[in-house]
């Protein structure tokens, strides 16, 4: 699935005027492309509001990161659970009206979550780096910054906000981008979870090497429907390379029950990332305990 990083007719600003030359393919072709185009614009604005040197100065005052990958490996629950803090999504709209990130994080930790994932996209998921920073202040387990990372600047934003790991989505990044962003993240002490959606993407990431934590998203990027057997199909096609590189597999999306969790574990997932199914529960702690079993 090809994702264009920018519109074919980017807007040009001259003095107080902003315009774009008409183009027949000027609209995003899918929701992911729409998000990527908007993210590119957001990052440009963020750079002006808070220049990179100021972010770096903030990072230098922080304590060391927690080892996200090792924490998953050492989890007392099997598979390990990455519980997600997510208020809304493009496909589901508002997921949790009573959205109190701090309370949610505490409930997840009490429920037995191995790590947490925090959505930092504001436009489409109603998250933010402020949400991540607030959670970091009260939680001591590792945190994943979940966003649509396109630029190095965003990695510094994540680290400055208290992240221990970042998400890189293979579908929106070139090989060169993946390697470069990986290098920057590692230099900041961050773990990297690379997300793939099919066997072609997984093969591509495995050929690059150096990515010991990979997530298989069970959600179809075109229809946004979920199918848990995606984890099985994708992992099976690349089983030899996965074993050779000692990759820890994470199954993402579409996990609602204990049976779902056990199913993806049987497919080879050592960890699961669960968001919507938990976010819709009134009692998050008990819901997570029941899911873990």
From Swiss-Prot:
Keyword Lyase (UniProt): yes
Gene Ontology process terms (BP): L-tryptophan biosynthetic process
Disulfide bond sites: none
InterPro entries in UniProt: Aldolase_TIM (IPR013785), Indole-3-glycerol_P_synth (IPR045186), Indole-3-glycerol_P_synth_dom (IPR013798), Indole-3-GlycerolPSynthase_CS (IPR001468), RibuloseP-bd_barrel (IPR011060)
GO molecular function, one term: phosphoribosylanthranilate isomerase activity
Protein's pathway: Amino-acid biosynthesis; L-tryptophan biosynthesis; L-tryptophan from chorismate: step 4/5
The EC number(s) this enzyme carries: 4.1.1.48
Keyword line: Amino-acid biosynthesis, Aromatic amino acid biosynthesis, Decarboxylase, Lyase, Tryptophan biosynthesis
EC category name: lyase
Domain of life, per lineage: Bacteria
Catalytic reactions of this protein: 1-(2-carboxyphenylamino)-1-deoxy-D-ribulose 5-phosphate + H(+) = (1S,2R)-1-C-(indol-3-yl)glycerol 3-phosphate + CO2 + H2O
NCBIfam families given in the database record: PRK00278.1-4, PRK00278.2-4
HAMAP family documented for this protein: IGPS_B
Family: Belongs to the TrpC family.
Designated name of the protein: Indole-3-glycerol phosphate synthase
Species: Prochlorococcus marinus (strain SARG / CCMP1375 / SS120)
Gene name in the database record: trpC
């Amino acid at each position: 699935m090809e994702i264009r990083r920018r519109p074919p007719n980017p807007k040009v600003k001259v003095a107080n005027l902003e315009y774009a030359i008409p183009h027949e393919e000027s609209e995003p072709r899918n929701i992911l492309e729409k998000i990527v185009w908007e993210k590119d614009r957001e990052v440009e604005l963020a750079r002006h509001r808070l220049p990179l040197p100021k972010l770096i100065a903030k990072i230098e005052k922080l304590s060391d990161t927690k080892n996200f990958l090792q924490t998953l490996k050492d989890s007392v629950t099997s598979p390990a659970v990455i519980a997600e803090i997510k208020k809304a999504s493009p496909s589901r709209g508002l997921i949790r009206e009573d959205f109190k990130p701090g309370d949610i994080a505490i409930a997840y930790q009490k429920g037995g979550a191995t790590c947490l994932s925090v959505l930092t996209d504001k436009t489409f998921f109603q998250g933010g780096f402020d949400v991540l920073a607030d959670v970091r202040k009260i939680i001591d387990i590792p945190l994943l910054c979940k966003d649509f990372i396109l630029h190095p600047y965003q990695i510094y934003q994540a680290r400055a906000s208290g992240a221990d790991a970042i998400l890189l989505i293979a579908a929106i990044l070139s090989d060169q981008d993946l390697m470069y962003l990986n290098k920057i993240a590692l230099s900041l002490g961050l773990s990297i979870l690379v997300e793939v959606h099919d066997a072609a993407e997984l093969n591509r990431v495995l050929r690059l090497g150096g990515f010991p934590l990979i997530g298989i998203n069970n959600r179809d990027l075109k229809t946004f429907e979920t199918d848990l057997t995606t984890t099985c199909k994708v992992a099976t096609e690349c089983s030899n390379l996965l074993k050779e590189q000692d990759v820890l597999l994470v199954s993402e999306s579409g996990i609602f029950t204990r049976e779902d969790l056990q199913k993806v574990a049987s497919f080879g997932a050592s960890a699961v990332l669960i968001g919507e199914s938990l976010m819709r529960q009134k009692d998050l702690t008990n819901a997570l305990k029941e899911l873990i079993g």
